Amino acid sequence: IEKNNPDVTKLPIPKTWPLDGGNFITLPLVVTKDPETGEHNLGMYRAQIFGPREIALHWQIHKHGAAHADAHATIHDPSATTTTPVVRSGRMPVAICIGGPPELVFSAIAPLPDNLEEYMFAGFLGRRRLRITKAVTQDLCVPAEADIVIEGYVDLGETRKEGPFGDHFGFYSLTGDYPVLHVTAVTRRKDALFPATIVGQPPMEDGYLGEA
């Protein structure tokens, strides 16, 4: 467990294409939580390393991660006659989990209905109860069998330029403004593995994963 000055640059995070903007975690299981319901979401959004304790999270506006960020940032007064939001909190807890049971990866990319948590679906796929545990520095539950867990928070409203990234279309995606994860802890198994995939024009590893 690294809580004092954690450093994600110690991890074997690859840079796969010459013009990529940096090193990217390409199989990240990003955990966020709805502040209203407490339900967790597991999504796969590429993560660019900015430094020892800063990571960009490439979640688009239609993804659950972005929806949870909006919910943390604002709350609507049910008695109000307008929909003007009121600022709730400046930070949102986030965890990036790497490795663990393969059903977690499938659950993170599956188009599940909003009322079905990825953790529950992963347990269904594995035909067993998925073991989860509390994160050590953030108010989140994370898979107990993950090889590596990067914990931190997003300062709501803070963005930095992420990219470019060699994508599955065969071109580099453009740079864009995305949230920054500030790392508060890194936990890992003693025999941790660091799974990764190379993204590019099919046929590539990520294409076979998508077909599966």
Question: Across the structure, where does each feature detected by a protein language model lie?
Answer:
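Extended, highly charged
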Residues: I1-P78, T84-V180, T184-A212
